[in-house]
Every structure is written in C-alpha cells, then in structure tokens.
Amino acid sequence: SSAASDVYKRQAHACSLLVDEYGELAARYDKLHLFDVDVADNRGRYRESDDYAHGANVVVADTPVGKLGLTVCYDLRFPELYSALRQAGAELITAPAAFTAVTGAAHWEVLIRARAIETQCYVLAAAQGGTHPGPRETHGQAAIVDPWGRILAEQASGEAVLLATRDSAEQASIRARMLSLIHI
C-alpha cells in the first residue's frame, strides 16, 4: 500500500551504496537482517531495529568487473540471502561490516569463507575496527576471498586498500564442477 511505502521512505535504513565510475549512484541495498542480539561484551545488548527499518530486496548490479551482490554486516549470517544473490547472477558479493570484537574474533573469517564457498562467488569483506561510542568495540578485518574459499588479500587492522585478481575462468570451472545451484 502507499501508506506502508510512505512509512518505509521516512525510516532510516542501514544501507550499502554502489557508486559507478562516473560518480553516479548505481545501486542501493537496504540491510535485510537487523542486528538484534545479546553479546557477551562490554555493551551486551544490540537492537538495530530501535533505530532502523529492514530492507526488502536482494540487489545485484552490473559492474565493469562482474555482477556484484550487495549485503551489510549481520546479513553475513544468513546463507539464504547469499544463495538468493547467487541465483540472481552475482559473481562477487560485498560484505561491509562492523562485527563486535567478540563475534568478529570467533566468526568473521569463517563466515566470509563459508559464503564464498557456498555461493562460488568472490566475497569482498571490509570490517571497521576499534573502539566506538556506546561503548562498542569492533573486530576489524578486511579480506578478499575467492570462490574456493581462499583468502587472496587480507588486512587484520588499520586502513588499507586490498587488491586481488578475479579469475573468471577459474570461477566458471568451479561452478561447472560443483553444480550447487541445481541442488537448491
């Protein structure tokens, strides 16, 4: 309904924006899965739904390097979303994040590698790190993972630009040998 649409437009969203080579907005993804959890850290309780509305759409955009699927942070814990991105044609998937220090140390690398393997996509994962108001402490690690689950480039903390070569022939070979999409 239009009333629901108006409410959606007025609420804040945690989103990922894709800007093209001309500086124009090419795609926008509003985070589907809000971080409403309790963590054994100095903050304890996180409730993104107090401040944000969840999104409604899976987003895959054409880019000069391939079809790019967009996600945000906690979305990483939902393989169904990543599967939907793959089914929509994604070849690479972004995962900008702010995992807590506790959850990031335990799960970050495992999750980014698992999503790459499951989808047979490159995962481009960047996580802020450090101490923030609230108090909130984030894990911080950036990595590029290939469709076989290998970490091609990585930065444990601090600022960095990561580069890796996308081997589309190898990606096609992996996808041809492991026909995971037909088993969904």
Name what the model sees in each region.
Residues 4, 11-13, 29, 139, ...:
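A structure-centric signal for secondary-structure junctions around beta-strands
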Residues 5-6, 15, 122:
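Proline-centered loop/turn at the N-terminus of a beta-strand
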Residues 10-88, 101-104, 108-110, 176-178:
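Active-site catalytic loop in hydrolytic enzyme cores
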Residues 67, 73-162:
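CN hydrolase (nitrilase-like) catalytic-core segments centered on the catalytic cysteine
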Residues 1-8, 184:
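Short, small-residue-biased leader/transition segments that mark boundaries at the very start
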Residues 20-21, 168-170:
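Non-catalytic surface loops within mature trypsin-like serine protease
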